[in-house]
Amino acid sequence: METLSFDSSALKKFVHPNELGEMQAMVTAADSELRNGTGAGADFRDWLHLPTDYDKDEFARIEAAAKKIQADSEVLVVIGIGGSYLGARMAVDFLHHSFYQAQTAADRKQPLVLFAGNSLSSSYIADLIDVIGDRDFSVNVISKSGTTTEPSIAFRVFRQLLEDKYGVDGANARIYATTDRQRGALKTEADAEGWGTFVIPDGVGGRFSVLTAVGLLPIAVSGADIDQLMAGAAKAEATYVNPDLTQNEAYQYAAYRNILYRKGYTTELLENYEPNMTMLAEWWKQLAGESEGKDQKGIYPSSANFTTDLHSLGQYIQEGRRNLMETVVKLAEPNHNVKVPSAKSDFDGLKYLEGKEIDWVNTQAYRAVVAAHTTGGVPVMTVNIAKEDEFTLGYLIYFFEVAIAISGYLNGINPFNQPGVEAYKTNMFGLLGKPGFEEIGEQLKKEMDD
């Protein structure tokens, strides 16, 4: 099959064919805003041509740094949160063995890529230190500013660990900072200490940054082919340029989401039938939620892992509130297949499946779920992908990025800012006693005591 295809055939009872056509003028306008820079947030559109217009010299430095880390480290600790975490984590999970972390070094062949700075759990940090043990390791700290609380705390911990193990000079040779090109606390410290540095481009927001050094260095260290990742994204960039809805499946997805949203389907479940796509949904949730959830509107992004979650969420999806729509990422060709074996006893009633490939069973489950859920009043869309490889992943990343950008403009918002994330941070800094936030902290404590 082709690398990616979008299937809207299960929407027939929910969307009249004329409705998609009526969206064309709005989609064309949204496309113009995106490509001509006339829409809100225009300064953050550099991801749009990133698959073909990127810094080739930096790309070569990323590949060289990855080889060095592979040569001198058994573990790479990637420190970041949000877009500085989810893209790389998603790709490592998507492209590697389902039990990647449990593989032996000989089987894995490349360093184990682990993640920190994505929570404030002290137990997680302690456990990660325990897992690293006496193995050689390097650190990739990712932050535009260098002052984001979670990664900054984690970096202090792992920098100290490096210095205790290798000395200051040895530690500095194992630290790689992905940060602003010219300014910020992390950039200043990196230049002073001589760390290897890579750039977070000014015109690329965190949730759109997986195809920059933010994602590419950890992905390359894991042993994945980042040239193929970029090639897949470049193919998608070339594919999704025509705003004609009969020709552009990414724009179809954006249009259908908005049609359904306006009919009251306000929550979208991104679903998969492969466990190693769990983090794909986490990455997508930030991409969609942070792009669209503003001005008291927007589709709420959620996720489910099938068939597992059919045994927990299945009842609600089938008969709960009718505010759900589903988008399934369906894999056509798994990396491995296993057949249902024959057995002496048919105590489990599976004789009728003997000799069948488990992936075939998985596909029939998917077909049955689509039929049941649409009958129950839940619209279902499917994004079919050919394989779990780098080219396909790059293509899929770009599909979702351009679709979400168009979807945001269709809903009349700026898809590239995130002003709402500052509210909790201001309160947290007040409660932590950060200089400059004391008054806020005192007010909050008073309110909480009352």
Swiss-Prot record:
Gene Ontology biological process terms in this record: gluconeogenesis; glucose 6-phosphate metabolic process; glycolytic process
An MF annotation (GO) of this entry: glucose-6-phosphate isomerase activity
Location in or out of the cell: Cytoplasm
CDD domains per the UniProt record, alphabetical: SIS_PGI_1, SIS_PGI_2
Top-level EC class as recorded in UniProt: isomerase
Pfam families: PGI
Reaction(s) catalysed by this chain's protein: alpha-D-glucose 6-phosphate = beta-D-fructose 6-phosphate
Family recorded in the similarity comment: Belongs to the GPI family.
Protein name according to UniProt: Glucose-6-phosphate isomerase
The organism of origin for this protein: Limosilactobacillus fermentum (Lactobacillus fermentum)
